[in-house]
Structures are given as structure tokens and as C-alpha cells.
Regions:
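Short, flexible loop segments at the rims of nucleotide/cofactor-binding pockets, characterized by
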Residues: 1-3, 30, 73-77
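Acidic, PIN/NYN-like endoribonuclease modules and their adjacent C-terminal/linker elements
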Residues: 87, 92-122
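A short acidic, often aromatic-flanked loop/helix-cap motif at beta-alpha or helix-coil junctions
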Residues: 29, 58-62, 120-122
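A secondary-structure boundary/capping signal
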Residues: 24-27, 101
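Active-site neighborhoods of divalent-metal-dependent phosphate/nucleic-acid chemistry enzymes
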Residues: 51-100
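A generic structural signal for alpha->beta connector loops
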Residues: 18-20, 49, 94, 111
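Short, well-structured N-terminal submotif of metal-dependent ribonuclease cores
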Residues: 1-23, 32-44, 115, 121-122
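Residue-level signal for well-ordered alpha-helical positions
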Residues: 34, 66, 108-112
């Protein structure tokens, strides 16, 4: 687990040297699990220079369409997966996406540039 922590810290630091870091409410929710107080999370976000963005309606619409494709591909979930909101937001905003879990993003959002730790694919 520490390997991923170090990778994440390193890539966020490197990427932020030349790019603005953005998260949306879905990522905010996922990250909040690691904090005891909202103030701690807000401080961390501020220190990292991360901007929190609303998910555009175009991305919400795309999320629904991708979810339908997922269901047609024998997906079993009853509502859109968090990664679908994240991938759709990256798609409509032309953002790069830093992630360790590339499978769903490659399948449903092939146009998004993924930044990931899989050295065999670099």
C-alpha cells in the first residue's frame, strides 16, 4: 500500500509543476475517507493547490450514456459507477486523468490520456 502512496505523492508533485490539479465532488468524496475532519481535507487540498470543480452537465449526460453501454456489456451495477463520473468529466473537459485503475477508463473513455503507474505500458 505504501508503494501506491509514494507513487501518488510523486506523480501529483511532478504533474503540479506544469499543470493545475483538479478534482470534482466524486474524487473529493473518495479522498475524504482518509480524513477525520473536513478542515483537514480542505487544508490538504489548499496546500496541494488543487481546485475543486463542479461536474459539467455535459459530463453528467455522458455518464448516463456510458452507464447504458456498461449495462449492455453485462455490467451488474444498478446506478452509474463513480469512475464513470470522473471519466466523463475528464473527457468533456479534456483533462488528463491520474489513476491506478485504468481498466474502466480505457474501456469507456479511450480518448482520455491516462497517467498511471503501469511501467510495462509506458
Amino acid at each position: 500500500m505504501l508503494v501506491w502512496l509514494y507513487w501518488s505523492e510523486n506523480i501529483l508533485d511532478q504533474y503540479s509543476q506544469t499543470n493545475t490539479l483538479y478534482i470534482n465532488s466524486i474524487v473529493y468524496t473518495e479522498v475524504s475517507i482518509g480524513f477525520n475532519k473536513i478542515e483537514e481535507l480542505e487544508t490538504a487540498i489548499e496546500q496541494l493547490g488543487i481546485k475543486v470543480l463542479e461536474i459539467p452537465r455535459e459530463a453528467l449526460f455522458l455518464t448516463g450514456k456510458v452507464f447504458l453501454k456498461y449495462r449492455k456489456n453485462t455490467g451488474t451495477k444498478k446506478s452509474p459507477l463513480p469512475d464513470f463520473f470522473i471519466g466523463a468529466h475528464a473527457t468533456v473537459s479534456s483533462f488528463d486523468l491520474i489513476t491506478r485503475d485504468i481498466t474502466k477508463f480505457r474501456t469507456y473513455f479511450p480518448q482520455v490520456r491516462l497517467i498511471h503507474p503501469n511501467l510495462a505500458e509506458r
